[in-house]
Amino acid sequence: MAYLTGIWHTFAGMKSATVNEIKQELSSVPPARLVHLCLRMAKFKKENKELLTYLLFEAQDEQAYIDSVKQEMDGLFGEVNTSHVYFAKKTIRKILRIANKHIRYIGSAQAETELLLHFCGRLKDSGLPLHSKTVLGNLYQNQWKKMYKTLQTLHEDLQYDYMKEVSRLEELE
C-alpha cells in the first residue's frame, strides 16, 4: 500500500509543460508519432476528441458549423420546462455550457458574438420571466455584456451588421 501511495504522490506532483515547450517538442516529433499522440489524446477525454473532430472535419466551413450549433441550441430551447423557473434555469445553463464549449472550439470573436447573440435572442424570446427572476435576468445580462464586449473587438463592418440585433436585445435593459 505504501508503494501505491508513493506512486500517487509522483503523479499528483507532475507539472505540465508550457505551451511553448510542447510546441517545440511537437516540431521535432515524426509525423507517424504525431498521429499516434493525437489519437491517444482523443481517446483520453471526450472534449479532446470533439475538438479534433472540429479541427479536422468542421473547421473548413465555419459558418455551417455555427449554424449547426444554433440548431442544436434551438432544439434545446424547445425543451425548456417553463412550468418551474428552477428547471428552466438548469436547461438554460446547459445550453450556455454547450454554446461556450463550441465557442472555445472555434476560437473566433465573430463566432462568439454570433452564438452569444443567438443565445441572448432565444432567451429573451423564450417568454421566461427575465425581469422578475434575478437569476435568469443576471444570466441574460452577463451573457449580453460578454457578447457586447466581444462585438467591440470585431471589424467595424461586422460590428454594424450585428448592431441591429443588439439594439433589439437592449430593449430588455
Question: PLM features: residue spans?
Answer:
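Amphipathic alpha-helical repeat scaffolds of TPR domains
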Residues: 70-74, 117-122
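N-terminal interaction modules that seed assembly of large macromolecular complexes
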Residues: 15-79
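Residues within HEAT/ARM-like alpha-solenoid scaffolds
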Residues: 87-94, 107-118, 135, 139
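Aromatic-anchored, charged helix-turn/loop surface patch used as a conserved interaction hotspot
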Residues: 63-103
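Short, Lys/Arg-enriched N-terminal segments with co-localized hydrophobic residues
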Residues: 2-13
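Eukaryote-biased recognition of C-terminal alpha-helical segments
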Residues: 135-173
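A structural signal for well-ordered alpha-helices, especially hydrophobic packing surfaces
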Residues: 49, 77, 96-103, 124-131, ...
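N-terminal intrinsically disordered, cationic/polar leader segments
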Residues: 46, 112-116, 122-123, 131, ...
